[in-house]
Every structure is written in structure tokens, then in C-alpha cells.
Amino acid sequence: MASYRNSRSRSRSRFRRRRRGRSRVRGRDARQGRSSRRRRRGKGRAHSGKKGRRSGSRRRKRNNNTENK
């Protein structure tokens, strides 16, 4: 992002392009919001295996703590 701040002329030209296609950007934002939810679900499933392994070790530790208590 620092490159955008350093090159102000480029950022202005890019903002002008974004201002011209605001309707398209809004439509894309709505689609991205839906796709992001699907992608988040997909990422959740993809990482769920890793999280399941980590949480499994954490659950075992919690169970060990309850057993020790």
C-alpha cells in the first residue's frame, strides 16, 4: 500500500477508473460478498482438517486436565 501513497498520480488515475465503474464495482462487491461466504466456507472446510487436528490435541489436553483434577 505504500507504493500507492508514494505514487499519488497513479492512485488518482486508479480512483478515477474506479469512480467510473462504481455500478460495476457495486455489483462485483455483492457477488464477492456471496462468493466470499462460499470461499470462507470452503476455506473453513479446508482448514477444518488442520483445526480439527489442533483442536483434537487441545481437547485431549483439556480432558487430561479434567482427569487430573
Curated annotation (Swiss-Prot):
Highest taxon of source: Eukaryota
Protein localization: Nucleus; Chromosome
Free-text tissue specificity from the UniProt record: Testis.
Compositionally biased spans, kind Basic residues: 7-25, 34-63
Keywords: Chromosome, Developmental protein, Differentiation, DNA condensation, DNA-binding, Nucleosome core, Nucleus, Spermatogenesis
CC terms in the record's Gene Ontology section: nucleosome; nucleus
UniProt GO BP: cell differentiation; chromosome condensation; spermatogenesis
Region annotation Disordered: where it falls in the sequence: 1-69
GO molecular function: DNA binding
Function according to Swiss-Prot or TrEMBL: Protamines substitute for histones in the chromatin of sperm during the haploid phase of spermatogenesis. They compact sperm DNA into a highly condensed, stable and inactive complex.
Family per record: Belongs to the protamine P1 family.
Entry protein name: Sperm protamine P1
The species this protein was found in: Perameles gunnii (Eastern barred bandicoot)
